[in-house]
Every structure is written in structure tokens, then in C-alpha cells.
Amino acid sequence: MSHSDQSQRFLFDDTDVRGEMVDLERSYSEVLAKHPYPEPVAQLLGEMLAAASLLCGTLKFDGLLVLQARSSGAVPLLMVECSSDRQVRGLARYSAESIGADAGMQELMPEGVLTLTVDPVKGQRYQGIVALEGVNLAECLSNYFASSEQLPTRFWLNANGRRARGLLLQQLPADRLKDPEAREASWQHLTTLADTLTAEELLALDNETVLHRLYHEETVRLFEPQPLVFHCSCSRERSANALVSLGQADCERLLEEEEGSISIDCQFCNQRYLFDASDVAQLFAGAGSQGPSETRH
């Protein structure tokens, strides 16, 4: 069974419903390798990576999709990005001493808020906000789509610190089925079947097996899988631009406080970018941002 990181789309030929499945191993492992997350945090972060990848697969755009959850609990921040090029990255901030071994989403992130942002290269930025309610992230996202003016969409998510998996079903505008009652009956039928899939099966089975297990009596068209990879968009140039935005006076003050070298660390991948006095002088002289080579923690 192949576990290569991928998203795979499928359609039901006899009704107006499409689906997407996501499988993340290597990219999920690379995200977790950057920080020593407790197991419950790693699991929730994996579910968010799968969810963002699923959502990105339903959109036709050139840009970035961001899922961000904030709370007043042990995990004040979870943030995941997926680009239209199917590149993912993610991070979490947490207080380890207050996290139980079996803590769920509501224990980790009480009174939380989930923000979905679609930021296209061209066009208008979209943002939706919903309370982080429900037993788990899949229920929260499903409730968000049910309560907003979006296409009805359901999610099934699971992660175990090694593999993150997701299944999405989305009802499309009326085409094959025009009758509202027939559309609703078809939607309820397909989602009810998906509800019989256990979390263990979602993690253990490949896409074709999952679809056969659920929909062997339906006509399902499975498309070619699309690769997903971990990629961090940080760069020395972006770090230099951040310093320029601070202004020369603040940068010179930082140089004094940091004993002659400013370091900027990427919170996603732990890459560190160093700028000495000569680099800072070049930035504000308009001579570019080239300087010492990058080093890691």
C-alpha cells in the first residue's frame, strides 16, 4: 500500500456530490520534526494539515489557504497553510505542563475560534470565522459549512503522529438531480455511509479500499492523485524585508541589544537568518539583502 503524500478527488456519477481524500506522512513528519509536540497536539495538528489540504483541493485558485485556531487553553494557537501548489506547513504553540495524555480538542482549546482564510494572488481575500465547537475538528468544520452560505460539506479526519488522513464530501450545485428532495436524500445517503467509517479504518486503508468499503454499490469515478509536500516559504529576502519595515533606527537598536547581530527565526521550520551591522547598512542603503550564509538551530 502506497503512503506517498497525496490528495485524490472522486465524483459520484449519478448525483451531485464530489469527494476528496488526503494522505499525509512525510510532510506531516517534517512538520512534527521541527518541534517536540506532545501527542495530543501532534494529532490535532495533523488533522488540521489534512483539513487544509482537503479544502485546498476543492478550490480553483492561485494562492494560499490558511486555517488558524486560537484559544485561551493549553494550545493558544494552531496554524496550517496549504498553497494552490499543494505545499503545506504548520505549527502549534502550547503549554506542555497542562496537557493530558488523552486530551481532545475541547480540552486543548477551550473557547476557541477557528479562522479560514483564502488569500488568492489575484482577487479578493476571503475570511470566515467560527467558534471551535464540536467533539472534534471534523465536526467543527462540518458545522461551519452547514451554518454558512457555502456548499454543504462534511469532513472525516484522523491523525496519530505518524500519518494524517482526511475524507471530504461536498454537495455540488444541482445538475444531475434537480429535485430538492432527491438531492437531499442522496446527500444524506452518502454521508451516512461515510459515518460508518471508523477512525482506525481511515488511517489504515488506502483510498480505493475506503471507497469500495463505503460505496461499492455506487458509481464512483476516482481521479489521479496529486502530490502534497512540506515546504516553508520563509526566506532571507522576506526576513530582510521585515527588518526594513521596522526602520533603520530600530534595527540599529536591535544590533546593540543583540551584540552586533540580529537573528530572525522562522516559527514554522526553525530556520534562522542572521544579519550583522554590514547587512543592516546594506538594507537601508538599497544594496540588497545578501549577507552571511543561513544557519539552523
UniProtKB/Swiss-Prot annotation:
Superkingdom per UniProt: Bacteria
Subcellular localization(s) per the UniProt record: Cytoplasm
GO molecular function, one term: protein folding chaperone
Modifications after synthesis and translation: Under oxidizing conditions two disulfide bonds are formed involving the reactive cysteines. Under reducing conditions zinc is bound to the reactive cysteines and the protein is inactive.
Presence of keyword Disulfide bond: yes
GO biological process: protein refolding
Coiled-coil ranges per UniProt: none
Cysteine disulfide partners in this protein: C232-C234, C266-C269
Record InterPro entries: Heat_shock_Hsp33 (IPR000397), Heat_shock_Hsp33_C (IPR016154), Heat_shock_Hsp33_N (IPR016153), Hsp33_helix_hairpin_bin_dom_sf (IPR023212)
Pfam families, per database record: HSP33
Main location: cytoplasm
Keyword vocabulary terms for this entry: Chaperone, Cytoplasm, Disulfide bond, Redox-active center, Stress response, Zinc
GO CC terms of this entry: cytoplasm
Chain's role: Redox regulated molecular chaperone. Protects both thermally unfolding and oxidatively damaged proteins from irreversible aggregation. Plays an important role in the bacterial defense system toward oxidative stress.
Similarity annotation: Belongs to the HSP33 family.
Name assigned to this protein: 33 kDa chaperonin
UniProt organism field: Pseudomonas aeruginosa (strain LESB58)
